[in-house]
Regions:
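Positively charged n-region of N-terminal signal peptides that target proteins for export
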Residues: 1-11
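C-terminal motif of bacterial Sec signal peptides marking the signal peptidase cleavage site
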Residues: 15-19
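Bacterial signal peptide processing site
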Residues: 21-24
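Secondary-structure "cap/kink" motif recognition
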Residues: 26-49, 124, 130-142
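Post-signal-peptide N-terminal segment of Sec-exported extracytoplasmic proteins
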Residues: 40-77
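Solvent-exposed, acidic/flexible segments
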Residues: 54-61, 86, 126-129
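Short, structured surface segments that line ligand/substrate-binding pockets
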Residues: 74-114
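Short, well-ordered, aromatic-rich surface patches in folded extracellular/luminal domains
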Residues: 97-142
Length: 142
């Protein structure tokens, strides 16, 4: 009888530890963006246009990167494609690294159902504050 109580205790303990470890929906993972000093330039363009804007000013690069990092909240949703699906209009940000020519990191900004999002391919989807979205998209209007 003591043997069964001991086994039950061990199994319940394992169950408790594994249940506490799964926090998929409540995760608060942070977006991984390059450091501003490692970025040579940022290309900003709409998916519907070939024309875009190239930002090379280091202060502007830092404002954009920090703005995204500080104003996003994890949605818990996964990104499983190279670009957003079922979204007709989005903004592409390409971060060109100083030491990695030809291989920029990419994020997508878009609006869906009155909310604004940042999607990093295969890393996740984050909710973005509206004012930050508007500030970044205003670069395309200049």
């Amino acid at each position: 009888m003591k043997k069964y109580v001991g086994i039950a205790f061990v199994l319940i303990t394992i169950l408790i530890f594994t249940a506490c470890g799964s926090n998929k929906n409540g995760s608060n993972k942070k977006m991984v963006l390059p450091k501003a000093e490692e970025v040579k330039e940022i290309d900003i363009m709409k998916n519907t246009s070939e024309d875009g804007l190239k930002i090379e000013n280091q202060d502007e690069i830092e404002i954009i990167i920090e703005g995204i990092k500080e104003n996003t909240n994890d949605t818990g949703r996964e990104s499983v494609n190279d670009q957003p699906t079922n979204i007709n209009d989005y903004i592409i940000l390409k971060f060109h690294h100083k030491n990695a020519e030809g291989s920029p990191s990419v994020v997508y900004l878009y609006k869906d159902k009155n909310s604004h999002y940042v999607e990093q391919p295969y890393a996740g989807i984050w909710k973005l504050r509206e004012d930050t979205f508007n500030e970044i998209s205003s670069h395309l209007i200049k």
